[in-house]
Amino acid sequence: MGFTLLIDNYDSFTWNIYADLASVGGNPYVVRNDKITLKEIEGMFSDGELERIVISPGPGHPRTDSGVSRDVIAWGMGKLPILGVCMGLECIVDLLGGEIAYAGEIKHGKTSLVQHDSIGVFHNLPQFLSSTRYHSLSAQIQSLPSVLQVTSTTKESGVIMGVRHRTYTVEAVQYHPESCMSEGGRGLMANFIQMKGGKWGGENAWCGVPAEGEEEQPKAKTNGAPSLPTILNRIHAQRLLDVEQAEKVPATSPANVSTSLSLYASPPLINFRDRMVSTPHTAVMAEIKRASPSKGDIAPTASAPEQALKYALAGASVISVLTEPTWFKGSLLDMLAVRNAVDSLPNRPAILRKDFVLSKYMIDEARLYGADTVLLIVAMLEPQQLKELYDYSVSLGMEPLVEVNNPTELSLALEIGSKVIGVNNRNLHDFNVDMSTTSRVNAALNGRDVVLCALSGISSHEDVEKYVKEGVKGVLVGEALMRASDTKAFLRSLIGLPPLEVVPKSRPLVKICGIRSTDDAKLAISAGADLLGVILVPGTKRCISTSTAREISALVQSARSQSSSKPLEPSLSSPWFTTQSDLLSSRRKPLLVGVFQNQSLSDILSAVEEIGLNLVQLHGDEPQAWAKFIPVPVVKVFRVSPEGIVRGGEIRRPGLNQAILLDAGGVSGGGGEGKAFPWEHAKRLIQSGEVGSEGHMPLPVILAGGLTPENVGQAIEQAGEGVWCVDVSSGVEGEGGKVKEKVEAFVKAVRG
């Protein structure tokens, strides 16, 4: 009969291990870590005497205080079973490249409940074993080598209590199973001494650990406890507590959330699946991810709406917002801010609540805070619960993204009718990534009509191309995007798109304002003006009556009927003002603009209806939000002082007025006073760019104030790219109104 070599790392608990091994027939032979050489151990093995090795607990750090232990482990892996206890576990993890660091808690002579995976050394042992702990160090999940998997953790804090090699018969526990206060210690030792040889499977199949290359099947639950005591279980438990606390707060109680939804306090939805399949390229689900359990902090100070705009303007089809606060450092407020930030885009990305959704309440939360879809993780939900949550989400108009990790989970997802399925390449139990997971699941899909997405570990165009060739329609990318130095360029490179470039604009449009008669209108139209402005501000010198305005409108609409529009499909990547200026530029010309100043909204709406205005210009202190209630595009005037101070509202705010007009700070406010402001201020505003574009997309403006045929060319040149229209009134007038030669000269100076 062979023996068990027990390496003593100078710890009194070694003799407890000796007693347990002896009682179950392990025939232990004890030697201290500096009293034996590797050559001697090799000789024992060659002689057929050595059958297994145990590395004992001990003080200190494995690199400095474990003697021959690390060398023995390196030699013995793949040859014979190895069990590490406390210091023994730390030796194994450290040897294989993991990090041994502060466990987050100091436990000396304290007990904790340990939950485990019920296989290997834990075969047939009950869940929630009371265990004795004497340590302050532990393996760190973030750095755990991919060849190791977590087998057990403490129930209350999730500290790693056990690891196992995926290929070799190497097991380790952090706690002390040999202590008289620990449960199941001799059962654990009995399991260990039954193991044979150096690899799982074969004659070790009895203990349930799959051999290398075998598919690990989902474990049954034991006594109601989760079969895999991993980070996933910790998150599951914490999210249940989080939801319970949220439901107790009056403002976020289930009743109040439901009432808010019934009042349509939530933003409007778009169809998640349609947004995915309508994308002309591979759909990118770009994730906002500050941290993760496997990587720790990634971008802890990242602004969610700022990151979302980068993603959206680069062409993302979906923005995934992690709302889990403890491990991922996200929040529901992040998601609401993201939703608001992209709301003004013409074809905005769908918003995904990326969380561990466990209840209908969490789906209601998602809907209220701006999500278009939610993530349902098959691994976290019982089949009946999965079906109930899927159906409930669909009833709210949100087709869920259903996450799977293997063909068994895929079958469950298909059974409930999932239309969009994501394959997580990351195993949520140990957070290791296997990029072939998507390929295996895709093969099991057998061509079914679902939108398949790959969800983890994607960091290059080659990764994406591999999946696209297999029929994958979308990819979720998080960490790689969060770490990218140029987010937009990197996102586009993933799907083979060129970097974003600003398309040079044609020469600016021309607006002739202060039209007072049909004669003025005729000469402006004849000269080629694109927009004609009529002043409808009582008490100003160019104000005209409603009847005159109607006559001018009839003339303008007649001219428009003889012109043609340019077909325009709004770019997926264009921000608000760029999109609106492109749309206005593409319309039939000329367009009639009614100018108002500090008049009531009802007066403005009446004038639009009675006169037939194509646009409205708000020239006073009107709220920008009025633009939502005016049925035609709105030009909002902002006044620029000689010092460059801008007044009139939030000039770069998207989603309200369709156009920005820069004018000098006048007295009457009716325009046409012939005063200019320094055009370098216009250039500064233009170059500040659209919100979220980081200055790469100029802010389109209408330039007004003191322009003449003589200076308009200089004004355009000094203000720079971004002037999409110039506005003139007094600069083309004489004593009797508009002067034909001046109007023609102005248009010619603009167009060259």
Curated annotation (Swiss-Prot):
| Organism, as annotated | Cryptococcus neoformans var. neoformans serotype D (strain B-3501A)
Q: What is this protein called?
A: Multifunctional tryptophan biosynthesis protein
- The lineage's top-level taxon is Eukaryota
Q: What is its EC number?
A: 4.1.3.27, 4.1.1.48, 5.3.1.24
InterPro entries associated with the record: Aldolase_TIM (IPR013785), Anthranilate_synth_II (IPR016302), Class_I_gatase-like (IPR029062), GATASE (IPR017926), Indole-3-glycerol_P_synth (IPR045186), Indole-3-glycerol_P_synth_dom (IPR013798), Indole-3-GlycerolPSynthase_CS (IPR001468), PRAI_dom (IPR001240)
For biological process, the GO terms are:
L-tryptophan biosynthetic process
Glutamine amidotransferase type-1 domain residues: 3-202
Cite the active-site annotation: C86 (nucleophile), H176 (for gatase activity), E178 (for gatase activity)
Q: Explain the purpose of this protein.
A: Trifunctional enzyme bearing the Gln amidotransferase (GATase) domain of anthranilate synthase, indole-glycerolphosphate synthase, and phosphoribosylanthranilate isomerase activities.
Pathway it acts in? Answer: Amino-acid biosynthesis; L-tryptophan biosynthesis; L-tryptophan from chorismate: step 1/5; Amino-acid biosynthesis; L-tryptophan biosynthesis; L-tryptophan from chorismate: step 3/5; Amino-acid biosynthesis; L-tryptophan biosynthesis; L-tryptophan from chorismate: step 4/5
| CDD domains per the UniProt record, alphabetical | GATase1_Anthranilate_Synthase, IGPS, PRAI
Q: Specify where the region named N-(5'-phosphoribosyl)anthranilate isomerase lies, as residue ranges.
A: 509-752
Gene3D superfamilies reported in the protein's UniProt record: 3.40.50.880, Aldolase class I (3.20.20.70)
Segments for region (Indole-3-glycerol phosphate synthase): 231-495
Query: What are the record keywords, sorted?
Result: Amino-acid biosynthesis, Aromatic amino acid biosynthesis, Decarboxylase, Glutamine amidotransferase, Isomerase, Lyase, Multifunctional enzyme, Tryptophan biosynthesis
Recall the GO molecular function terms of this protein's record: anthranilate synthase activity; indole-3-glycerol-phosphate synthase activity; phosphoribosylanthranilate isomerase activity
Q: What does it catalyze?
A: N-(5-phospho-beta-D-ribosyl)anthranilate = 1-(2-carboxyphenylamino)-1-deoxy-D-ribulose 5-phosphate; 1-(2-carboxyphenylamino)-1-deoxy-D-ribulose 5-phosphate + H(+) = (1S,2R)-1-C-(indol-3-yl)glycerol 3-phosphate + CO2 + H2O; chorismate + L-glutamine = anthranilate + pyruvate + L-glutamate + H(+)
Family annotation (SUPFAM superfamilies): Class I glutamine amidotransferase-like, Ribulose-phoshate binding barrel
Query: Where, by residue number, does L-glutamine bind?
Result: G58, P59, G60, S136, L137
